[in-house]
Design a protein with these regions (language model features):
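Interaction interfaces in information-processing and related assembly proteins
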Residues: 2-188
């Protein structure tokens, strides 16, 4: 388990809340521990980033677990984020390294006929599980679909990865923008 680099929250006067998460160290460490090739490393890093963003959206130091059933050769991807500082995760069947990372490959491997289960843990309540069927798209668009359907909050998620020529992660960061109830939809 690795401590996240940084998470920042912003709230505009127009009623738009933004949470930015940088999980570069956690993504690098996961790539190293699990000996992941580029495609698997980027996908796991993005799922770790999604878990971090979702966990910081909750109150009372809640934790969140993602169970991402890909229906691809990757199998299931697991990620947890808790205490506002920690993330961990793994891929059931990492790819063999012959496929270089591209956004099109990411979408193919994470979303086709897949399902995302999100479990929220709270000190005050019983765990709550919700799920969404995944449409075609990358990791971030699948998380956006989950939030928009499950939380019914107008949201947009972006998660980006930067790798070197050998496929090692250089940077892994993302954000969620959400329209607050008093926010102006025209500005979102």
């Amino acid at each position: 388990m690795s401590e996240m680099n940084r998470i920042d929250h912003y709230l505009s006067t127009d009623g738009i809340r933004i949470t930015v998460a940088d999980v570069t160290d956690a993504a690098r460490r996961a790539q190293e521990i699990h000996h992941l090739p580029s495609l698997s490393a980027v996908i796991l890093g993005k799922v770790l980033n999604a878990a971090a963003i979702l966990a910081m959206d909750f109150k009372n130091h809640e934790g969140v677990s993602l169970k991402w059933v890909t229906n691809s050769p990757l199998g299931t991807i697991h990620a947890d984020a808790y205490e506002g500082r920690y993330v961990r995760g793994f891929i059931e069947n990492p790819d063999d390294g012959t496929i270089p990372y591209t956004p099109a490959e990411e979408a193919k491997w994470v979303s086709q006929r897949g399902k995302l289960f999100v479990t929220r843990y709270s000190l005050l309540k019983m765990p709550y599980v919700s799920a969404v069927d995944l449409a075609d798209g990358d990791t971030a668009s699948c998380v956006s679909d989950y939030i928009n359907s499950s939380d019914q909050t107008l949201s947009h998620v972006e998660i980006e990865a930067l790798t070197d020529k050998e496929g090692k992660i250089i940077r892994m960061a993302g954000f969620i923008a959400q329209l607050m109830p008093e926010g102006d939809k025209k500005l979102f």
